[in-house]
UniProtKB/Swiss-Prot annotation:
EC number: 1.3.5.6
Enzyme class: oxidoreductase
SUPFAM superfamilies associated with the record: FAD/NAD(P)-binding domain
Biological source species: Nostoc sp. (strain PCC 7120 / SAG 25.82 / UTEX 2576)
Obligatory cofactor(s): NAD(+); NADP(+); FAD
Gene field: crtQ
Annotated keywords: Carotenoid biosynthesis, FAD, Flavoprotein, NAD, Oxidoreductase
Protein name: Zeta-carotene desaturase
Function: Catalyzes the conversion of zeta-carotene to lycopene via the intermediary of neurosporene.
Length: 479
């Protein structure tokens, strides 16, 4: 069976792997010059690895880890301390420390009761809210709890949290940075379903909240192993190939795709296959779908979905920004020093960040140079129209406010990557508009983390969606 896949993000790549394993002849068409979608990275003219976002691998990314094991990439992950660290103005740190002699849910309870990020009053109210949530039921009835959580999509997490006794202090100091890191929007604008789903995984499975990061850049340590695996099985991956049009025909009351028109520069060609998968992001699928298909609600609902803007900043320094204790270590350039983990903050326009020279040293540590901070500006709306230099200077000022001891260090290089439309906006009430991987078109399928799956718009969500798409194809087309 021949399958044509539009989009070489994780969703498209995951779809291709399962189809290739089943003996299908697969072609992937990607409009960008590199694969990976929102997890993409590339090397600039000066040899710097540039990423489109900050990519963290949670322990509950089970299907992604299975994929990585299959292609030989799981060993490229670096395990981090089981602690979620918050950096506040003035260099003060707080944490959710999940390290404990026993596992879930007790390690989570310990983390929330001992955190210095919240006041005693906030911690008590936090305990009341989480203690009256579906998460408690999930300890004995996971599927029943998930059904309840899915039904909470219509309200924001902030409204749900306050209605269960939670405080605005907890939202501001802890939950907003986490919501921004997960979905690029705050607790007032993110669905309760989205946040509680993640909490459910964390509460039930000890490993779910464990963090890992890649040894180096996504392209080198995630995508290249996938591409080698696919190429060994005959899959063809074409970059700089934009799909201009989906051709279709109707016969005997059934609509079928007959081909896709693919552009290579000024040239176009029509590709035919037995099955077609669009593994795009929100703007991509909205652009490529034939308008005539909007007569089906499954396709029309896609246009009710939205994507959020984000800006990712990378900054190189001549010392170690996150080294808070030792001035000599901070200024020396013989070895890396500082906080080797994902970091959150409630006191800057970037909600989460990391020093990649520490967390992912193979591509980002450079002898004789210091920190390479990667910071995610959320919400990204105010920054999309700003110049890269203005954004870098704005972020630098906030870095110095978080780490006053770093003011003696100089920024030596920066990069800014803006995405006007990035993650699917996980706003209240939007879940009902997310399409299934199977569509009303018999030989046309969807993948992408905006499609139906329980994980947020994430690497795991993309992987799950791709594997679901492959299963539907194999169940319905290849018989």
């Amino acid at each position: 069976m021949r399958v044509a896949i539009v989009g070489a993000g994780l969703a498209g790549l995951a779809t291709a792997i399962d189809l290739a394993d089943a003996g299908c002849e697969v072609q992937i068409f990607e409009s960008r010059p590199f694969v990976g979608g929102k997890v993409g990275s590339w090397i600039d003219g000066d040899g710097n690895h540039v990423e489109m976002g900050l990519h963290v691998f949670f322990g509950c990314y089970y299907q992604l880890f299975e994929l990585m094991n299959k292609v030989g990439a799981f060993s490229h992950l670096r395990l981090k301390e089981h602690t979620h660290t918050f950096v506040n103005k003035g260099g003060r740190t707080g944490a959710l420390d999940f390290r404990f002699f026993t596992g879930a849910p007790f390690n989570g309870l310990k983390a929330f009761f001992t955190t210095s990020q919240l006041s005693l009053q906030d911690k008590l109210q936090n305990a009341i809210a989480l203690g009256t949530s579906p998460i408690v039921r999930g300890l004995v009835d996971f599927e029943g709890a998930m059904k309840t959580i899915r039904n909470l999509d219509k309200i924001s997490f902030a409204d749900w949290f306050r209605s269960h006794g939670g405080s605005n202090g907890s939202i501001k100091r802890m939950w907003n940075p986490i919501a921004y890191a997960l979905g690029f929007i705050d607790c007032e604008n993110i669905s309760a379903r989205c946040m509680l789903t993640i909490f459910q995984f964390f509460a039930v499975r000890s490993e779910a909240s464990v963090l890992r990061m890649l040894e180096g850049s996504p392209d080198e340590y995630l995508h290249q192993p996938i591409l080698r695996y696919l190429e060994a099985r005959g899959t063809k991956v074409y970059t700089r190939r934009q799909v201009r049009e989906i051709k279709y025909a109707e016969a005997e009351g059934q609509t079928r795709v007959t081909g896709i028109v693919v552009a290579k520069g000024d040239e176009v060609e029509e590709i035919t296959a037995d099955a077609y998968v669009c593994a795009c992001d929100i703007p991509g699928i909205q652009r490529v779908l034939p308008q005539e298909w909007r007569k089906w609600s499954e396709f029309d609902n896609i246009y009710k979905l939205d994507a959020v803007p984000v800006a990712t900043v990378q900054m190189r320094f001549d010392g170690w920004v996150t080294e808070l204790q030792d001035e000599n270590k901070r200024k020396q350039l013989k070895e890396a020093a500082g906080l080797d983990n994902l970091l959150y903050t409630a006191d800057a326009d970037f909600s989460c960040f990391a020093d990649l020279a520490l967390t992912s040293p193979s591509d980002y540590y450079r002898q004789g140079q210091g920190s390479l901070l990667q910071l995610v500006l959320t919400p990204g709306d105010p920054f999309i129209k700003e110049s890269n230099e203005a954004i870098a200077q704005h972020v630098l000022k906030q870095v110095y406010e978080l780490f006053p001891s770093s003011r003696e260090l100089n920024m030596t290089w920066y990069s800014v990557v803006k995405l006007a439309q990035s993650l699917y906006r996980e706003a209240p009430g939007m879940d009902v508009y997310r399409p299934n991987q199977k569509t009303p078109i018999a030989n046309f399928f969807l993948a992408g983390s905006y499609t139906q799956q329980d994980y947020i718009d994430s690497m795991e969500g993309a992987t799950v969606s791709g594997r679901r798409a492959a299963k539907v194809i194999l169940d319905n087309i290849k018989k």
